[in-house]
């Protein structure tokens, strides 16, 4: 997979994108992004449905959601997991960091 993005031209309104992509290794991807100037929005977090997720904002203002599929979870197990406090806390953390970031807007990049 390849994703091509480019900066806004002179005089253009800011046009940041919100990208959600699956990667082989969330932690390695996040490390590479921060080494290139990205700011972490959401630390790597395992979620009940079997994905590890993280978010970062790149120097051009684009918000990246990176997912790594860790395991397949059957519906019965998923229901059980969502009853666990750790799963609820993880979802609240992931949702909260997004809400906080979106409240910052592009100027907060």
Predicted feature residues:
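Vicinal oxygen chelate
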Residues: 1-57, 67-109
């Amino acid at each position: 997979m390849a994703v091509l993005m480019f900066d806004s031209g002179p005089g253009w309104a800011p046009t940041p994108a919100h990208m959600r992509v699956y990667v082989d290794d969330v932690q390695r991807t996040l490390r590479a992004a921060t080494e290139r100037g990205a700011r972490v929005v959401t630390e790597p977090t395992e979620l009940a449905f079997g994905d590890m997720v993280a978010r970062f904002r790149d120097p051009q203002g684009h918000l990246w959601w990176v997912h790594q599929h860790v395991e397949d979870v059957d519906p019965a197990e998923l229901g059980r997991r969502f009853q666990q406090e750790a799963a609820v806390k993880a979802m609240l953390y992931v949702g909260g960091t997004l809400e906080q970031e979106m409240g910052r807007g592009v100027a907060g990049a």
